[in-house]
């Protein structure tokens, strides 16, 4: 079974990689820099501020905005962890030749002035790119350019790691010894532990509900658990209690916590920080946001605190700065040779420090891909039987492709005695680039969560968290019945919460305008004046709807008149073009910069007091595109705490032929405050 599973994934990953590379190459070779910026695939008007040494053979290139153009960096869709190219701005993207890496500029030695690296940190005023030290000479030439730009490219490292993992899975010989892997390849039946089941006597968090306690008790006593946490049900709090109870049961327990993104694991780390001794926590990889509470656990920062390591790093940085002033290429080369000798010494000392830090820790937090990092796996080189971990926890499992989830299982094979998966398979699956092969799409969109419950139809290992602490009961009602079999309950503390209950909101609104008292509003945009438009400036002509934008603006201004805070409002849409137009109006023209505007996909895991959802689609053919993806809409309608405002054409949803959309729109006609706007009132 392991060979069959690995073979299926290897062919799917290969196809997905090819599709991803072809799509990216086509865009980079056919669009201008400005078009790439508009589509979020490039950042321009930046310059090199500094180069410094990083951990184990890394350089950090720090880039800032060109103040002659803008005082802030327009980040687009580029995020931490993305693979990027850094180039001088005078280079034009080749639009005539086949995709290839092109010589953009040369230094005196004829080397290509182009760097490839990983986005390490991002803010509105600085981007840090992690480079391999082999690019040091090229990187320093960028000081001579007033403008640089960044291009987002395909992350082939991700595909390489998944393929390597699948090959190793296929090579495991029968009979498989690893009990957890036996479950996952359907070679071992799952039988819940009933003989030696021991209930936890005392929970540390007094606010846990019965479903959370049941999930924790089950996970403590069983070697395979899925914690199904719908939106707002306190999944993270449940995991935090579980981790603490594992350490109480066995103080020597070693836990690896993984997730598909930096944000997912950083949230857990942030919550663990005040509850677990600092020396037991270790964060491996590049944190998406270096919060103060997380910095103290970063392997990078902790290793650099070693006095000798710090001294060598400072000497390297000093030599790098001196290189800025050297005009002669020969002198620069000599300087780099000295730097390379220092780096060799630095690597040895860093590896020793890193090994000590890992062994000292009890909880290691990293992404799924980071779980096979050389820092962790190097411990097996000296002792292949070294017991590094006991428990693996994968959070947000439904946002990861299954091959990603196998990375820690294979990298640390025969280590784990317990596997805990947490997530919600009714929210968005991982993003798949393939569009032309249904088998590939199915293989990669079917998550480990989904496949396990198919293998074990009794679902004995699935523990459902049934109380949500986010949404007003009316907002929760349709998602509960349509996606969670009506099992979701609103806690009494949130069941009737409204915008008017916020401390800043005017408590005595006029009788004619009581939007702060209503949890669910729908602006029905039927009619020719609310027709969608294809935005030719965006990739594949993403859709936008100017009429809906006008309604969004009016509703925001109404909320602001009642002193609803800007940062309590979120505006989301399934379409990038609509998001771009909304940002231009709300952020640039109205200067309401604290209102968060995002795609639905980008808002997964977030929440706001009020969410305004612009559906965009309004056409005579009743086409809805990817609105028919139930999980995307489930994410959208479960983001708000106190008010959900939908702006969309009800007739299109009811006549598009999709049962879910028809059911939702009909339910809202009965349960929401439905309004029929006249476009003339909004212009």
From Swiss-Prot:
<dbReference type="Pfam" id="PF13087">
    <property type="entry name" value="AAA_12"/>
</dbReference>
<dbReference type="InterPro" id="IPR004483">
    <property type="entry name" value="SMUBP-2/Hcs1-like"/>
</dbReference>
<dbReference type="GO" id="GO:0005737">
    <property type="term" value="C:cytoplasm"/>
</dbReference>
<feature type="binding site">
    <location>
        <begin position="229"/>
        <end position="236"/>
    </location>
    <ligand>
        <name>ATP</name>
    </ligand>
</feature>
<dbReference type="GO" id="GO:0036121">
    <property type="term" value="F:double-stranded DNA helicase activity"/>
</dbReference>
<dbReference type="Pfam" id="PF21138">
    <property type="entry name" value="SMUBP-2_HCS1_1B"/>
</dbReference>
<dbReference type="InterPro" id="IPR041677">
    <property type="entry name" value="DNA2/NAM7_AAA_11"/>
</dbReference>
<keyword id="KW-0963">Cytoplasm</keyword>
<protein>
    <recommendedName>
        <fullName>DNA polymerase alpha-associated DNA helicase A</fullName>
        <ecNumber>3.6.4.12</ecNumber>
    </recommendedName>
</protein>
<comment type="similarity">
    <text>Belongs to the DNA2/NAM7 helicase family.</text>
</comment>
<dbReference type="GO" id="GO:0005524">
    <property type="term" value="F:ATP binding"/>
</dbReference>
<dbReference type="GO" id="GO:0003723">
    <property type="term" value="F:RNA binding"/>
</dbReference>
<keyword id="KW-0347">Helicase</keyword>
<dbReference type="InterPro" id="IPR048761">
    <property type="entry name" value="SMUBP-2_HCS1_1B"/>
</dbReference>
<dbReference type="InterPro" id="IPR041679">
    <property type="entry name" value="DNA2/NAM7-like_C"/>
</dbReference>
<keyword id="KW-0378">Hydrolase</keyword>
<dbReference type="GO" id="GO:0016887">
    <property type="term" value="F:ATP hydrolysis activity"/>
</dbReference>
<dbReference type="InterPro" id="IPR027417">
    <property type="entry name" value="P-loop_NTPase"/>
</dbReference>
<dbReference type="InterPro" id="IPR047187">
    <property type="entry name" value="SF1_C_Upf1"/>
</dbReference>
<dbReference type="GO" id="GO:0043139">
    <property type="term" value="F:5'-3' DNA helicase activity"/>
</dbReference>
<keyword id="KW-0067">ATP-binding</keyword>
<keyword id="KW-0539">Nucleus</keyword>
<comment type="subunit">
    <text>Associates with the hexameric DNA polymerase alpha.</text>
</comment>
<dbReference type="InterPro" id="IPR050534">
    <property type="entry name" value="Coronavir_polyprotein_1ab"/>
</dbReference>
<dbReference type="GO" id="GO:0033203">
    <property type="term" value="C:DNA helicase A complex"/>
</dbReference>
<comment type="function">
    <text>DNA polymerase alpha-associated DNA helicase which may be involved in DNA replication.</text>
</comment>
<keyword id="KW-0547">Nucleotide-binding</keyword>
<dbReference type="GO" id="GO:0006301">
    <property type="term" value="P:postreplication repair"/>
</dbReference>
<dbReference type="InterPro" id="IPR003593">
    <property type="entry name" value="AAA+_ATPase"/>
</dbReference>
<dbReference type="GO" id="GO:0043601">
    <property type="term" value="C:nuclear replisome"/>
</dbReference>
<dbReference type="Pfam" id="PF13086">
    <property type="entry name" value="AAA_11"/>
</dbReference>
<dbReference type="GO" id="GO:0003697">
    <property type="term" value="F:single-stranded DNA binding"/>
</dbReference>
């Amino acid at each position: 079974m392991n060979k069959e599973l690995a073979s299926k994934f290897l062919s799917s990953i290969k196809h997905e990689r090819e599709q991803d590379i072809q799509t990216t190459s086509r865009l980079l070779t056919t669009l201008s820099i400005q078009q790439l910026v508009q589509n979020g695939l490039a950042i321009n008007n930046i310059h090199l501020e500094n180069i410094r040494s990083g951990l184990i053979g890394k350089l950090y290139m720090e880039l800032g905005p060109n103040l002659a153009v803008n005082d802030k960096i327009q980040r687009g869709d580029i995020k931490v962890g993305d693979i990027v190219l850094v180039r001088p701005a005078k280079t034009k993207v080749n639009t005539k030749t086949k995709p290839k890496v092109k010589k953009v500029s040369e230094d005196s030695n004829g080397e290509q002035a182009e760097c490839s690296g990983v986005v390490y940190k991002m803010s509105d005023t600085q981007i840090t790119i992690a480079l391999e030290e082999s690019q040091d000479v090229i990187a320093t030439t960028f000081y001579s350019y007033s403008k640089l730009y960044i291009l987002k490219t395909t992350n082939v490292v991700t595909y390489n790691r998944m393929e390597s993992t699948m090959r190793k899975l296929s090579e495991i010989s029968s009979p498989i010894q690893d009990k957890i892997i036996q479950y996952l390849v359907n070679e071992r039946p799952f039988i819940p532990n009933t003989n030696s089941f021991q209930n936890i006597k005392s929970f540390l968090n007094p606010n846990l509900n019965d479903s959370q306690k049941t999930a924790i008790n089950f996970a403590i006593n069983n070697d395979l658990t899925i914690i199904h946490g719908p939106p707002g049900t306190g999944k993270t709090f449940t995991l935090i209690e579980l981790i603490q109870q594992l350490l109480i049961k066995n103080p020597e327990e070693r836990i690896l916590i993984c997730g598909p993104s930096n944000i997912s694991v950083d949230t857990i780390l942030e919550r663990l920080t005040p509850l677990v001794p600092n020396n037991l926590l270790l964060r491996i990889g590049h944190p998406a946001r270096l919060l103060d509470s997380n910095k103290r656990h970063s392997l990078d920062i902790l290793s650099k605190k070693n006095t000798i390591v710090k001294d060598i790093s400072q000497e390297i940085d000093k030599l790098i700065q001196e290189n800025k002033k050297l005009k002669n290429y020969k002198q620069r080369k000599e300087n780099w040779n000295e730097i390379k000798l220092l780096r060799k010494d630095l690597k040895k000392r860093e590896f020793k420090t890193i090994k000590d830090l890992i062994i000292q820790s009890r909880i290691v937090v990293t992404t799924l891909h980071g779980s096979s990092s050389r820092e962790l796996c190097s411990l097996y080189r000296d002792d292949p039987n070294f017991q590094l971990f006991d428990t693996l926890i994968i959070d947000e499992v439904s946002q990861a492709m299954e091959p990603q989830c196998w990375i820690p299982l294979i990298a640390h094979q025969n280590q784990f005695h317990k596997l805990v998966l947490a997530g919600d398979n009714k929210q968005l699956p991982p993003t798949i680039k393939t569009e032309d092969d249904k088998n590939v799409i199915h293989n990669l969109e079917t998550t480990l969560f989904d496949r396990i419950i198919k293998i074990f139809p009794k679902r004995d290992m699935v523990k459902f968290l049934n109380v949500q602490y986010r949404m007003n009961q009316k907002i929760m009602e349709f998602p509960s019945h349509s996606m969670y079999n009506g099992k979701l309950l609103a806690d009494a503390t949130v069941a009737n919460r409204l915008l008017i209950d916020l401390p800043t909101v005017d408590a005595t609104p006029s009788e004619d305008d009581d939007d702060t008292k209503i949890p669910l509003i729908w602006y029905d945009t039927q009619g020719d004046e609310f027709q969608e438009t294809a935005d030719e400036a965006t990739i594949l002509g993403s859709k936008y709807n100017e009429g809906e934008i006008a309604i969004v603006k009016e509703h925001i201004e109404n909320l602001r008149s009642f002193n609803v805070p800007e940062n309590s409002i979120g505006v989301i849409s399934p379409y990038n073009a609509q998001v771009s137009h909304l940002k231009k109006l709300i952020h640039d023209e109205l200067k309401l910069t604290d209102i968060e505007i995002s795609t639905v996909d980008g808002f997964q895991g977030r929440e706001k007091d009020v969410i305004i959802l612009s559906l965009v689609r309004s056409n005579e053919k009743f086409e809805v595109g990817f609105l028919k993806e139930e999980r995307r809409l489930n994410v959208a309608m479960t983001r708000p705490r106190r008010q959900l405002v939908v702006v969309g054409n009800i007739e299109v949803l009811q006549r598009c032929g999709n049962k879910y959309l028809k059911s939702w729109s009909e339910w809202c006609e009965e349960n929401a405050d439905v309004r029929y706007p006249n476009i003339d009132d909004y212009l």
